[in-house]
């Protein structure tokens, strides 16, 4: 865990993550595209590094300014990172959570994968929410505070 967090710190300080994300974000035009790319990058970090904390921290730091520029509430970023980062880690055999569950219960990850409904459906619902705009909150223009609707 310490080594992976160190790797994440090095990547952030070198500016590699920000450079890649900024070049990608410039090509995105719609809000739903930003949300889906955030989700996919969080899943990608999970797959390549296998550490759920980095799958939230790296994309979170990289995309937070893009969300603010587009006027999207940080709650949407938080939810997207959760859907693509934390809950997916149980499905990655070499991930921290996946290896813990597999070793604790003695069941390989690929065996319990079809029954992990929440982990499988959460990213799907996040994409549906982004495309339809349901649950996507925006900030007020003047104050950049969350808009609370009753």
Q: Model-predicted segments: where are they?
A:
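Alpha-helical membrane-embedding segments
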Residues: 2-8, 54-65, 93-106, 141-150
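Hydrophobic transmembrane alpha-helices that form the pore/transport pathway of multi-pass ion
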Residues: 45-83, 108, 145-148
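Juxtamembrane/interface motifs at transmembrane-helix termini
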Residues: 39-42, 55-58, 76, 95-101, ...
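Structural signature of transmembrane alpha-helix termini at the membrane-water interface
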Residues: 11-14, 44-48, 91, 102, ...
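Juxtamembrane helix-boundary/capping and inter-helix hinge elements in multi-pass membrane proteins
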Residues: 13-16, 29-31, 65-77, 103-110, ...
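Membrane-embedded alpha-helical segments and adjacent helix-loop junctions characteristic
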Residues: 1-65
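Juxtamembrane and boundary regions of transmembrane helices in multi-pass small-molecule transporters
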Residues: 98-103, 107-150
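Alpha-helical transmembrane segments of multi-pass membrane proteins
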Residues: 33-46, 70-91, 97, 114-121
């Amino acid at each position: 865990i310490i080594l992976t967090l160190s790797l994440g710190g090095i990547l952030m300080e070198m500016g590699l993550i920000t450079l890649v994300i900024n070049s990608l974000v410039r090509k995105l035009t719609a809000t739903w595209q930003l949300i889906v790319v955030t989700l996919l990058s969080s899943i990608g970090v999970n797959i390549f590094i296998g550490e759920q904390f980095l799958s939230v921290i790296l994309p979170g730091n990289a995309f937070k300014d893009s969300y603010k520029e587009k006027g999207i509430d940080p709650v949407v970023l938080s939810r997207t990172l959760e859907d693509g980062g934390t809950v997916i880690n149980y499905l990655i055999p070499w991930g921290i959570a996946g290896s813990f569950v597999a070793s604790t219960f003695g069941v390989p990850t690929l065996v319990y994968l079809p029954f992990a409904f929440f982990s499988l459906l959460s990213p799907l619902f996040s994409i549906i929410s982004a495309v339809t705009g349901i649950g996507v909150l925006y900030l007020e223009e003047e104050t950049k505070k969350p808009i609370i609707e009753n």
